[in-house]
Amino acid sequence: MLSPTNSTSKKAPVPPQDSSKPVLISEEPQNQLLQKVARTALAVLLVVVTLGLILLFYSFSDLQSFPWCCQTRPSTKEQPTISIPVPLPSPPLAVPRPSTPPPPVISRPSTPPAPTPAISPPSTPSAPKPSTPPPLPPKAPKPVKTQEDLLPFVPEQVFVEMYEDMARRWIIEALVPAWDSDIIFKCLCYFHTLYQGLIPLETFPPATIFNFKQKIISILEDKKAVLRGEPIKGSLPICCSEENYRRHLHGTTLLPVFMWYHPTPKTLSDTMQTMKQLAIKGSVGASHWLLVIVDIQARRLVYFDSLYNYVMSPEDMEKDLQSFAQQLDQVYPAYDSQKFSVKIAAKEVIQKGSGSSCGAWCCQFLHWYLRDPFTDALNDLPVDSVERHENLASFVQACEAAVQDLPELFWPEAKALF
């Protein structure tokens, strides 16, 4: 059965398209795309060229002067200045003034030069010139003070005296060495062999300004106990037996009390500590030896300080010893009720020019007192300090030779009581 459609109306079948082949773009849209790309590239190129020209132009100018510049460092280039011509004012009227004359010369006085009149412009009429005042007298030049002028003038004789004093001190220090407690005790032992009434009291530990009164009272109390046949209450010496010490107390009539003094410590314990520190260092420092002689037979307290007032003034020391003498009158009264008197031996500084001969001077004074207690040997001292210490050096050499064979810190044997 035939189809109702006509055969002539049938179309030819379309062949299937191959999907693998690319679809071609028409030429008109492709040209438009190329034009856009070209315009964009040209615009970018123009912008780059413009910026390059701007940077090239401003490389020769100061970019930092613009407010939008990020740098804060000031510009070091000079700014162009615009000079505006200003009309010059008319010159002022010239008034002649006297010129200052040069400084005077010592050889001949100089005449001040005549004043030079100023030339005024011809176009400006000159005013009448006033009368020229007389020149002022030249001022005297101020003296220039040098460093030598600022220093005080010291005569040559002063330097000579200073040198002589230094040489004198060196000689004195070489003549008399410093004596320690061991040599002083040996010297006392040697004096005991010459004068049996002297008791060689130990100098270590030495008495001080804080305990010398208690030490003297303790010795006198022990002497009274020995005379009564009673046991002594005080401490025994380190290097002396009790029997030997009792014999010394029984026959003694003179107590030589050496005091060690230092101005710094204010108590007994501090004084002992200072003495130990100086002994460790091997230095005498500011220490000083003093001597108090208790003459039991003559009932006298004799105080000797070779520096005269190193501890205190002689007046104050005399008052203090007067009070102590009254105390001794009660501790050790005399049979005839005689009171203890006080004597300050030194009337001036004895050891002039020497700082370490105090121990030797104390022993020298004790030796003079033992020979003649009623003659003041200090009045016969030489005035010259070198000659004075030369005499002391002779005494020191004699004592050192005499005590050379004595044992260390050993008391000599006292005579028997009966």
From Swiss-Prot:
The chain crosses the membrane at residues 40-60. Residues 86-141 have a biased composition (Pro residues). The keyword RNA-binding does not apply. GO terms for molecular function: cysteine-type deubiquitinase activity; deNEDDylase activity. Keywords: Hydrolase, Membrane, Protease, Secreted, Thiol protease, Transmembrane, Transmembrane helix, Ubl conjugation pathway, Virulence. It comes from the Bacteria. GO terms for cellular component: extracellular region; host cell; membrane. Residues 1-10 have a biased composition (Polar residues). Residues 1-23, 72-143 are annotated as: Disordered. Coiled coil: none annotated. It is an enzyme of class 3 (hydrolase). The active site is at H288, D305, C358. It is found in: Secreted; Host cell; Membrane. It is a single-pass membrane protein. Effector proteins function to alter host cell physiology and promote bacterial survival in host tissues. This protease possesses deubiquitinating and deneddylating activities. This is Deubiquitinase and deneddylase Dub1. The gene is cdu1.
